[in-house]
Amino acid sequence: MHTLSISTVALAALLSGCGAMAPATGGKAPIGMKVTSTAFADNGTIPAEHAGVGDCGGKNVSMPVAWTRLPAKAKSVAVLLSDPDGAMGLGVSHWVAYNIPAERGQLKANETGGFTVGTNVAGATAYRGMCPPVGDHPHHYVLTVVASDLAPGALPAGLTRDALLAALKGHALGGQSVVGLYSR
């Protein structure tokens, strides 16, 4: 059985009303946001280079992520990487990036400029590569893009995942995720 962390439930609650934003399409399924990564397919295995360094087996390279079909009023996006399986099911925040201009459309692997990096689980303002326990089941890494009506630069530096979600409440226009798996 897969359990959800508190922060994952909070993100779902934040985005729960966003589906109604899509225009009617005459009986066809509505077209919403699309999030992809060239590093892995949805529910695919994440390459080791995106894991943490040292015993974690990687190079601590942040994942590339792209977004399309944003809501019309989107001004900025936030990118979040979390592991709901980590910390004994309480979840781990690996990457908090925000104040990203919506029209940018992507972040490349290991890109660091032109946006604000928030605080990860270790208290650092940086991408933190994956490092699940050796021999543990594959962890699910949820890479989420949230579109908002906030102008790029509107949010202060150093926000944690929870603080960012609180700041986006009432400003989120939609969100979408891609999930990757990683184990050691």
Task: For the regions a language model picked out, list residue spans one by one.
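Positively charged n-region of N-terminal signal peptides that target proteins for export
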Residues: M1-L4
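Short hydrophobic/aromatic-rich motifs at helix boundaries and adjacent loops
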Residues: I6-V9, D136-P138
